[in-house]
UniProtKB/Swiss-Prot annotation:
InterPro entries, sorted: 6-PGluconate_DH-like_C_sf, 6PGD_dom2, KARI, KARI_C, KARI_N, KARI_prok, NAD(P)-bd_dom_sf
Domain KARI N-terminal Rossmann intervals: 1-141
Source organism of this protein record: Buchnera aphidicola subsp. Macrosiphoniella ludovicianae
Residues at which NADP(+) binds: 1, 11, 41-43, 91
Protein name, UniProt field: Ketol-acid reductoisomerase (NADP(+))
Domain KARI C-terminal knotted: 142-286, 287-343
Binding-site residues for Mg(2+) 2, renumbered to this chain: 150, 322, 326
Gene3D superfamilies cross-referenced by the UniProt entry: N-(1-d-carboxylethyl)-l-norvaline Dehydrogenase, domain 2, NAD(P)-binding Rossmann-like Domain
Listed pathway(s): Amino-acid biosynthesis; L-isoleucine biosynthesis; L-isoleucine from 2-oxobutanoate: step 2/4; Amino-acid biosynthesis; L-valine biosynthesis; L-valine from pyruvate: step 2/4
Keyword Oxidoreductase: yes
Keywords: Amino-acid biosynthesis, Branched-chain amino acid biosynthesis, Magnesium, Metal-binding, NADP, Oxidoreductase, Repeat
Catalytic activity entry: (2R)-2,3-dihydroxy-3-methylbutanoate + NADP(+) = (2S)-2-acetolactate + NADPH + H(+); (2R,3R)-2,3-dihydroxy-3-methylpentanoate + NADP(+) = (S)-2-ethyl-2-hydroxy-3-oxobutanoate + NADPH + H(+)
Positions of the catalytic residues: 65
Length: 343
């Protein structure tokens, strides 16, 4: 923004300190070969409309999520190439994984109606390489597949299940006379600790961290959870494929996020979010030994999300990214700020 440049605020200081070219929309975009739009989905239509007025012929417009194209039906000038590089995690985790010399699994795609010079895929590959995505795996997808699988993963195992399970497991621990601080810490850091095993050996390694008797119990619990949630997961998938889920979300945007803000308020005031600090150390194995239900929920949620996506026609690699592989990175956000960052 011009005002930020004139006042030389913190963003300006950070950018100039790291030798970035600083300028406003009108001065930078007309000369840019690649313009990346990383604004929130609900702002895309207005942002993209303004970008197109300034972008030069044969430039590239980049997305990290294709909601605006697929669900809003946004049309882009035919002389602009439209690509997507979608890391499968929150933006904060993309940066953290890059800083430690790695990256996150990434989907890339070219919008079929906007590949003006047939160079879209090469540009997308280069962009994914620059974020370190190639170190974790880059999969060519499509705008439609990325959006539908992303929404399904978020609404089920990645966000929906983790959030609900955090609240339910906390209440369960309290009813069994556990200290509120201990219960809060076990759940807040338990998801991160337990899902770390998924990175290295999938569900098999996660289950192997349990004793034989606990493993049997977790397996039986997971089967029961899958039976209970199967129809709900299928309904989520049907609503996402049909566009019903997105239309309701867009309507809430128009209502100034009334539903979203109400849900955030309710979550903020739950017992889990308000749980006190606990300064005693919980050993790594203790998270598994006292988190059998959490392990069962993870196993059931991952398998059910994956299976439901496959049944709807989403390819296995994409379903895997959106069910198992992204899960540890989402769990990290709970470890940082409980459910605040996720929401």
């Amino acid at each position: 923004r011009k005002n930020s440049i004139l006042k030389k605020n913190q963003s300006w200081i950070n950018a100039t300190k790291n030798n970035f070219l600083v300028g406003d929309y009108e001065s930078l975009i007309p000369n840019a070969d690649l313009v990346i739009n990383l604004t929130p989905d609900k702002q895309h239509s207005n942002v993209v409309k303004e970008l197109q007025k300034l972008m030069k012929k044969d430039a590239c417009l980049g997305y990290s999520h294709g909601f605006n194209i697929v669900e809003n039906g946004e049309t882009i000038r035919k002389d602009i190439t439209v690509i997507m590089v979608a890391p499968k995690c929150p933006g904060t985790e993309v940066r953290e994984e890059y800083k430690r010399g790695f990256g996150v699994p990434t989907l890339i795609a070219v919008h079929n109606e906007n590949d003006y010079s047939n160079m879209g895929l090469e540009v997308a590959k280069a962009w994914a390489f620059s974020t370190g995505g190639h170190r974790a795996g880059v999969l060519e997808s499509s705008f439609v597949a990325e959006v539908k699988s992303d929404l399904m993963g978020e609404q089920t195992i990645l966000c929906g299940m983790l959030q609900t399970a955090s609240l339910v497991c906390y209440e369960k621990l309290i009813t069994t006379q556990n200290h509120p601080g201990y219960a809060g810490k076990l759940i807040q850091f338990g998801w991160e600790t337990i899902t770390e095993s998924l990175k290295h050996g999938g569900i098999t390694l996660m289950m192997d961290r349990l004793s034989n008797s606990s493993k049997i119990r977790a397996f039986k619990l997971s089967q029961e959870i899958k039976r209970i949630f199967s129809k709900l997961f299928q309904k989520h998938m049907d609503d996402i494929i049909s566009g019903d889920f997105s239309s309701k979300m867009i309507q809430d945007w128009k209502n100034k996020d009334q539903n979203l803000l109400n849900w955030r308020y309710k979550t903020k005031n739950t017992s889990f979010e308000q749980s006190p600090d606990y300064d005693k150390k919980i050993l790594e194995q203790e998270y598994y030994d006292h988190g059998i239900l959490m392990v069962a929920i993870l196993k059931a949620g991952i398998e059910l999300s994956f299976e439901t996506m496959i049944q709807s026609g989403i390819m296995e690699e994409s379903a895997y990214y959106e069910s198992l592989h992204e899960l540890p990175l989402i769990a990290n956000t709970i470890a940082r700020k409980k459910l605040y960052e996720m929401n």
